[in-house]
């Protein structure tokens, strides 16, 4: 059984064709600059690159070219489109309606449109991608897998903001959380590595990329997460500010005479480690600058590590203890220095790190010592595989 996994952005599209027998990706691809001059599709099969450069006015044209690349006689991996058993779509926001993945029909599409107000940047391109696939592959079942779904198990006291209750009832203003597919994947892998049932474990998962969030997993369910109503909340990130005093935004508008759009740009695109360091949003650049003595770069890293450490401490309280901590995503998988800094100061939990194992980059590995009271893992995330598994399970029903 072969499943196509699609992740649509506003002008880009990532895809993988996964053979579910071996759970291996037969092809991985990226389409860039959709609707802009210089559109390009890059597909990788066994390390070999295949490139298509031609105008793509919209996502429908992009998906046409994806299918063309997959069945290409020389560079493709299937002989006919009918080999694609189903398509799994990453959808950022499922609102309160969806606590799990769902088979897409017209009713689901209406519900996705209703969620646009909650994710105005992300859901529209997700919807466009689904519509394009449905048009080009009308007989192929499609499944929506939501970033928010895993966190729908949060208790009401964890997702409710202390605002007038009507804002929640009438406008859906509450904590939703994101990166759910990643948190779900790495927590399940951690339980396998420990040889235990996830339902018997208390796990804190740290998805640390340019966007970053933590999740507290108890009895296999998300009970707390750091992102909120939007992916802006929680930790300091690459360019996002994370949790700040909301009155700062009013100060920026009233005293600094900034428009809402200008404030939005500052808190989403000019803040985080980029804002503090003035160097970059790329942690490799900031680590390099800090090593060369750049004080603001060092401060940016200190702030970042502090917010992650602080949140791990809080989630230990939420869970009443912790059995395992997992690091994943770009920084979590590749920065030994960041992992070490984050865990410094958590010795009271009985965490002990094996310095040699911690030097490994991008590998699935346990980095804690044998006598560490808390297991610490680095687990490369695989959201596409999780989407494919859900798609297989739902279309088999």
Curated annotation (Swiss-Prot):
GO biological process, one term: acetyl-CoA biosynthetic process
CDD domains assigned to the protein according to its UniProt record, in alphabetical order: ASKHA_NBD_AcK_PK
Residues engaged in binding Mg(2+): 7, 383
Presence of the UniProt keyword Cytoplasm in the record: yes
Catalyzed chemical reaction(s): acetate + ATP = acetyl phosphate + ADP
List of residues binding substrate: 90
Protein name: Acetate kinase
